[in-house]
């Protein structure tokens, strides 16, 4: 091979390398679309690797790059393999993420799946979180709709609301004091559902809701209608130790739509000494405060600020300690690549110890199914 040919090949390789580097660098100025892209159900918006534009986060086993990052909130990262110059990689779960079990199947950390046509679920470090694919079934029907009911539509998975136009419309003001409950609502209670119908179009309160409903007039609601605002209590934490998930259902929003809210919770750190801190003669240690400020972690990201949270302790007589009073704090998290997001986090104020334990023995707890939910969690 002649020297001129070798030089030509060397120049070509150099130009190719420079081209790849140029494509992988960030622009001097950001130019983003006026409207954020619309993502598939369960897919969130994240900033690209240059910190410029919001893009739909890539999911497990999808191609990724600097401009198409993976979904950090699900514990995914872009794996470029052994190549240091690769421009594209594949979204993989971080190694520390734990798999999930659902319906006798194992799903990897960061994996998304549909257990049925009405839910889209994702495994996040041992916990399964789901979003509804039929939101119209969860929303409250128009309060001017007499005797509304959900009906199946041929060829569709989701049911739709229909109204009984032949019924006489009663005045809402005359029905505000007709709140009640009957046995037919037991199944709805089990499913954490809220419904605003009944005989004579009376508005009813289900016992799953811990507080009395309040009627609000909000000009943002459709046609300026009244909204019966109801919110369930937060469910118990999905894990007895370590980071878990707590949920509740509410329609306290501008559209009066029934939505599920989640928050991160930690009853106690895993590996917390059980009996070493008990005083002489004491059988329980109700509440313990972190000895030093710590950062909360979620999906491989850490809280921006440090906190000194309280945790629930343990007992030696078979009782278990669970949160009694809590509050919810919106917390900012930062990932290693600079991506930031906010999550609601449970902060314990006090704990109680009794024999009404969510599972027989916290020390031997391995598998826990969250009541009123379709999820399973594994430590």
Swiss-Prot record:
Q: Which PROSITE patterns match?
A: CTCK_1 (PS01185), CTCK_2 (PS01225), IGFBP_N_1 (PS00222), IGFBP_N_2 (PS51323), TSP1 (PS50092), VWFC_1 (PS01208), VWFC_2 (PS50184)
Organism (species): Rattus norvegicus
Q: How does it assemble?
A: Interaction with integrins is heparin- and cell-type-dependent and promotes cell adhesion.
Q: Which residues form the VWFC domain?
A: 98-164
Using the record's annotation, list all stretches that form the CTCK domain. 284-358
Reply yes or no: does the keyword Phosphoprotein apply: yes
- Which PANTHER family does this UniProt record tie to the protein? CCN FAMILY MEMBER 1 (PTHR11348:SF18), CONNECTIVE TISSUE GROWTH FACTOR-RELATED (PTHR11348)
Has UniProt tagged this entry with the keyword Phosphoprotein? yes
Using the record, list the residue span of the signal peptide; answer none if the entry has no such feature.
1-24
> What functional role does this protein have?
Promotes cell proliferation, chemotaxis, angiogenesis and cell adhesion. Appears to play a role in wound healing by up-regulating, in skin fibroblasts, the expression of a number of genes involved in angiogenesis, inflammation and matrix remodeling including VEGA-A, VEGA-C, MMP1, MMP3, TIMP1, uPA, PAI-1 and integrins alpha-3 and alpha-5. CCN1-mediated gene regulation is dependent on heparin-binding. Down-regulates the expression of alpha-1 and alpha-2 subunits of collagen type-1.
One matching Pfam family is Cys_knot
Gene Ontology biological process terms from the UniProt entry? apoptotic process; apoptotic process involved in heart morphogenesis; atrial septum morphogenesis; atrioventricular valve morphogenesis; cell adhesion; cell-cell adhesion; cellular response to angiotensin; cellular response to hypoxia
Q: Which InterPro entries match?
A: CCN, Cys_knot_C, Glyco_hormone_CN, Growth_fac_rcpt_cys_sf, IGFBP-like, IGFBP_CNN, Insulin_GF-bd_Cys-rich_CS, TSP1_CCN
Q: Name one GO cellular component term.
A: cytosol
Instruction: Please give the positions of the paired cysteines in each disulfide bond.
Output: 26-50, 30-52, 32-53, 39-56, 64-78, 70-91, 284-321, 301-335, 312-351, 315-353, 320-357
GO MF annotation terms: extracellular matrix binding; growth factor binding; heparin binding; integrin binding
The lineage is: Eukaryota, Metazoa, Chordata, Craniata, Vertebrata
* Span of domain TSP type-1: 226-271
Give the span(s) annotated as Heparin-binding.
277-313
Which family does the similarity line name? Belongs to the CCN family.
User: Where is it located?
Assistant: Secreted
Alphabetized UniProt keyword annotations: Cell adhesion, Chemotaxis, Disulfide bond, Growth factor binding, Heparin-binding, Phosphoprotein, Secreted, Signal
Query: Phosphoserine occurs at which residues?
Result: 184
Q: What is this protein called?
A: CCN family member 1
Q: Where is each IGFBP N-terminal domain found?
A: 25-94
């Amino acid at each position: 091979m002649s020297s001129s040919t070798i030089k030509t090949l060397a120049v070509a390789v150099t130009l190719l390398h420079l081209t790849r580097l140029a494509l992988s660098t960030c622009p001097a100025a950001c130019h983003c679309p006026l409207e954020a892209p619309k993502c598939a159900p369960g897919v969130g918006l994240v900033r690209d690797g240059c910190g410029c534009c919001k893009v739909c986060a890539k999911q497990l086993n999808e191609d990724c790059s600097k401009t198409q990052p993976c979904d950090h909130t699900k514990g995914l990262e872009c794996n470029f393999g052994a190549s240091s110059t690769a421009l594209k990689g594949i979204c993989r779960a971080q190694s520390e993420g734990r798999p999930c079990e659902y319906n006798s199947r194992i799903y990897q950390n960061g994996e998304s799946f549909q257990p049925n046509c009405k839910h889209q679920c994702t495994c996040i470090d041992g916990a399964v979180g789901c979003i509804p694919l039929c939101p119209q079934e969860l929303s409250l029907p128009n309060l001017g709709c007499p005797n509304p009911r959900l009906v199946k539509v041929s060829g569709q998975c989701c049911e739709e609301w229909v109204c009984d136009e032949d019924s006489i419309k009663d005045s809402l003001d005359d029905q505000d004091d007709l709140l009640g409950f009957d046995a037919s609502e037991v199944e709805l209670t089990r499913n954490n559902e809220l419904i605003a119908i009944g005989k004579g179009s009376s508005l009813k309160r289900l016992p799953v809701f811990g507080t009395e409903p309040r009627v609000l007039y909000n000009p943002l609601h459709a046609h300026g209608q009244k909204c019966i605002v109801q919110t369930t209590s937060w469910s118990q934490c999905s894990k007895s130790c370590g980071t878990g998930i707590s949920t509740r259902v509410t329609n306290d929003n501008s559209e009066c739509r029934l939505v599920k809210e989640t928050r991160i919770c930690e009853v106690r750190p895993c590996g917390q000494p059980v009996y070493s801190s008990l005083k002489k003669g004491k059988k329980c240690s109700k509440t313990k405060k972190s000895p030093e400020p710590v950062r909360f972690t979620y999906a491989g990201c850490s809280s921006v600020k440090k906190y000194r949270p309280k945790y629930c302790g343990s007992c030696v007589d078979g009782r278990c300690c669970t949160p009694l009073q809590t509050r919810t704090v919106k917390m900012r998290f930062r990932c290693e690549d600079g991506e930031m997001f906010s999550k609601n986090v449970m902060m314990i104020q006090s704990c109680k110890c009794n024999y009404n334990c969510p599972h027989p023995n916290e020390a031997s707890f391995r598998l826990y199914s969250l009541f009123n939910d379709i999820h399973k969690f594994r430590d």
